[in-house]
Amino acid sequence: MRCLAPRPAGSYLSEPQGSSQCATMELGPLEGGYLELLNSDADPLCLYHFYDQMDLAGEEEIELYSEPDTDTINCDQFSRLLCDMEGDEETREAYANIAELDQYVFQDSQLEGLSKDIFKHIGPDEVIGESMEMPAEVGQKSQKRPFPEELPADLKHWKPAEPPTVVTGSLLVGPVSDCSTLPCLPLPALFNQEPASGQMRLEKTDQIPMPFSSSSLSCLNLPEGPIQFVPTISTLPHGLWQISEAGTGVSSIFIYHGEVPQASQVPPPSGFTVHGLPTSPDRPGSTSPFAPSATDLPSMPEPALTSRANMTEHKTSPTQCPAAGEVSNKLPKWPEPVEQFYRSLQDTYGAEPAGPDGILVEVDLVQARLERSSSKSLERELATPDWAERQLAQGGLAEVLLAAKEHRRPRETRVIAVLGKAGQGKSYWAGAVSRAWACGRLPQYDFVFSVPCHCLNRPGDAYGLQDLLFSLGPQPLVAADEVFSHILKRPDRVLLILDGFEELEAQDGFLHSTCGPAPAEPCSLRGLLAGLFQKKLLRGCTLLLTARPRGRLVQSLSKADALFELSGFSMEQAQAYVMRYFESSGMTEHQDRALTLLRDRPLLLSHSHSPTLCRAVCQLSEALLELGEDAKLPSTLTGLYVGLLGRAALDSPPGALAELAKLAWELGRRHQSTLQEDQFPSADVRTWAMAKGLVQHPPRAAESELAFPSFLLQCFLGALWLALSGEIKDKELPQYLALTPRKKRPYDNWLEGVPRFLAGLIFQPPARCLGALLGPSAAASVDRKQKVLARYLKRLQPGTLRARQLLELLHCAHEAEEAGIWQHVVQELPGRLSFLGTRLTPPDAHVLGKALEAAGQDFSLDLRSTGICPSGLGSLVGLSCVTRFRAALSDTVALWESLQQHGETKLLQAAEEKFTIEPFKAKSLKDVEDLGKLVQTQRTRSSSEDTAGELPAVRDLKKLEFALGPVSGPQAFPKLVRILTAFSSLQHLDLDALSENKIGDEGVSQLSATFPQLKSLETLNLSQNNITDLGAYKLAEALPSLAASLLRLSLYNNCICDVGAESLARVLPDMVSLRVMDVQYNKFTAAGAQQLAASLRRCPHVETLAMWTPTIPFSVQEHLQQQDSRISLR
């Protein structure tokens, strides 16, 4: 809003001459301030120019009103202003009137919708300068600002005034017609260097008309027009910059850092004050809601305007956290309660340990995707990517969350799900996010709230969003109402973490549940979560979930905006963790010995890809190494946990371990892993369990809340209860192995580690298993259960089980260490094992390899879409009993390259000879590219002197299907044609595969050129490829090259007309080996059909000609069929 000082009565302005003089007019006292001035003949520019030239000595002082301790409005203040306007009817009406006035004054291009009565709502109390008098008369030559109905009808040639120049404490913004001349003086030289005493530095937004010929701007080319003072950003470096193309309506921006003193052109204070607009409620900033703030200026990055601390976005190690609580004093501060809550929340998260025992080894975060599903089910499964096509999230958690902010629409909630198996470190990863925010590595968020999902399984319907953020977590947060109001105004700067999503009850209906639309309405916790997932509550926030996937994902997870998986430790990361563990324990002398113990147990080494199990191995190794040099780790997972709990059970109260096992089982039945202190049967049991580390307080949890330190420990204790309990009938025990699906089972296998531990506890020798935990009396009670399970396992037929159940059976048999069961399982394995689409973890690959070696027969493995790691693939391929295998092309080529680099010639030769791709179906562009890499590998080998011969996979390929569809098909087909001649044994080329590839005439022409090299081709399927007469002509020209081999030719459902039919009829007698030809659903007429029928009579070798098409009269087709029965109309 312009801040103008009306001239006192009796002033005169000179007549304009050219473009620099003003018309002579008499100005009397103006009453009503802005409104009368707008309707008067006074030109504000001339008025100010007149004051600039006149001697003000002896005149009444005119003072610009300035509020002390004010600043330009920022985004947070403006948001509060809007919220208060919405709640106050009078304020909302007043600001609506001001908005109409602003639109009338400044937005000239939108005058069509305004009228004179926009001022009728402004009362006398809102009129500025009401004590001033109206002029008696105005000059006839002055122009009033016309109202819309007074404007000419043709507004096309009407040009709005140039945008005003804006000068801030650090910025000067304005239109510049010619910026070739840079200012020769520092920017303060444009104004008074030494303002008069008593004058205030401008702290509000003012606009002062400046003539272009002003001497003070002689070195800076600015057009005539108003200059606006906005003292805002003071963090820019000293200097003056010009930024072109700054934004709409501004041709240039001049940025200057430094104090801007009072302008010399402003008249000294007078007897009256020109008041500003009403100050907006709860806002210490500018007196005008339309004054631009720092956030309104172009080219300013958001973090520089909204970050509450001096934070850096680059990576910071957990041990090098900057001072997170240091708040910039150059930015507008939050209210004191918000600042205090912000600091306390940072202190809370920053005090949490980096990992178990303070050890942190970061695991890889992999982008996940869902399987394509043609069913209508809302639940979908995770796809299993090949090892080579995994997409790692570069930059870790910070990059994931930064990308989430960049790719979402404004005010749109972003849901991110991080998935992982039990023990992969999801909860520690979620804690790492909170610590990263506390250390200043996530400046895009003002607040982070981490809530374990087990805290949300509470009854009642009187909860609100404020309870979810502050009260329902493990440790309630103290926050004033002002903090909650601040959060609601900026939800896009809030990160909410829900850890352990699998522990929520009825988690599959959040997207369809009803919830209150307003945050203040109380509802159930389920309603609150539904409001978050339906993006009605706290809309615009980032919602981060961690969950353990079990089969199909519920819709709340499958509909997430981004999916990631924790891949666990690699072999190198596991060994690094072992080294750091013993280093932190002060036992560096045992580091090498511990690694040797681990390498001697390949199963435990493969299980160490799980951070939880890797830590358990380190704990047991530490205990064994303290006993002596002859220490050895157990060979099974059951033995690992027996070793960990055996020492704790030695000095336990009577029955304490059994009571703890029962408690773990009951919690697992309810999908829970946390418990209260009063749930223990006695205080002695609780004290013992806490002292031995079997239960512990979760981070930031209440004193009465306890949890098992790992999910696998809970599974082991649950299996221990099943092995000891007399409450479970023996005949029901096999159901808990979960190897054969049943419609009714006692539990849903939520404790997914129970089957393996149960087999190990029951079948392993009692002296080193149950007897070591509970004594000889407990071991005697499992004899009957052992017989029941042995009978059940020996009746199973491994060849009838699904791949996942077969792997679980192998794990159970391995844990049992019972020779009869192991021999039965491995000898019943089928010769062809397919794990297509079933994920193979490192322990799966190890147990499978042991079973294949013990079987004593040859096997063919299908390892496609299993995500098997390179070391696991190499170990299986290297087995002598594996004669053939299929795996992802990219993984196999990478394995060959690795073996060649390491000089493993024999293993490389075996891997090349055993690999097959028969049959091969290309369903994506990546499949075609991988096939091209395979052919390129063969060509490289052929040109090398030390190797010779074709790759068996390329040489023996007989069937190739191309099914990319109409979008990718035309793009990928030329790449396939270029490598097609490498498959010398190709017999079946299917370019239909129930998908319209639409290779067209161009594709047929390219394919025809390869026919002379495809000597073995017997079946050619070109159906549904948009082939016309031109394509049929090209095909007919090249078909004689296949005369000796081609048996079946299909051109079903193309666009072949009579000319194309004639071309095919002409070549048909030359195809001496052809037996079946299909030209149904084309566009040729009776003439084309008759030519084909006539040619067929000269081809006694052809058995069937399918040629029904709707363009031929049925009577003609029937007549042709009567003449030759080989014509098929079906």
Swiss-Prot record:
List, in alphabetical order, the Gene Ontology terms for molecular function in this entry: acyltransferase activity; ATP binding; DNA-binding transcription factor binding; GTP binding; histone deacetylase binding; protein serine kinase activity; protein serine/threonine kinase activity; protein-containing complex binding
Renumbered to this chain, region (Required for acetyltransferase activity) spans 94-132
Entry note about domains:
The acetyltransferase domain is necessary for activation of both class I and class II transcription.
Instruction: Describe, as the record does, how this protein assembles with itself and its partners.
Output: Interacts with ZXDA and ZXDC. Interacts with PML (isoform PML-2). Interacts with TAF7; interaction inhibits CIITA acetyltransferase activity, thereby repressing transcription.
- PTM comment text: Autophosphorylated, affecting interaction with TAF7.
Q: Write the protein's name.
A: MHC class II transactivator
Q: Which CDD domains match?
A: LRR_RI
Which residue ranges does the record assign to the NACHT domain? 414-724
Per the record, GO CC terms? cytosol; nucleoplasm; PML body
What function does the entry list? Essential for transcriptional activity of the HLA class II promoter; activation is via the proximal promoter. Does not bind DNA. May act in a coactivator-like fashion through protein-protein interactions by contacting factors binding to the proximal MHC class II promoter, to elements of the transcription machinery, or both PubMed:8402893, PubMed:7749984,. Alternatively it may activate HLA class II transcription by modifying proteins that bind to the MHC class II promoter.
Looking at the record, which segments are called Disordered?
269-303
UniProt-annotated binding residues for GTP: 420-427
Compartment(s) of residence = Nucleus; Nucleus, PML body
Keyword terms: Activator, Acyltransferase, ATP-binding, Disease variant, GTP-binding, Kinase, Leucine-rich repeat, Nucleotide-binding, Nucleus, Phosphoprotein, Repeat, SCID, Transcription, Transcription regulation, Transferase
Does DNA damage appear among the keywords? no
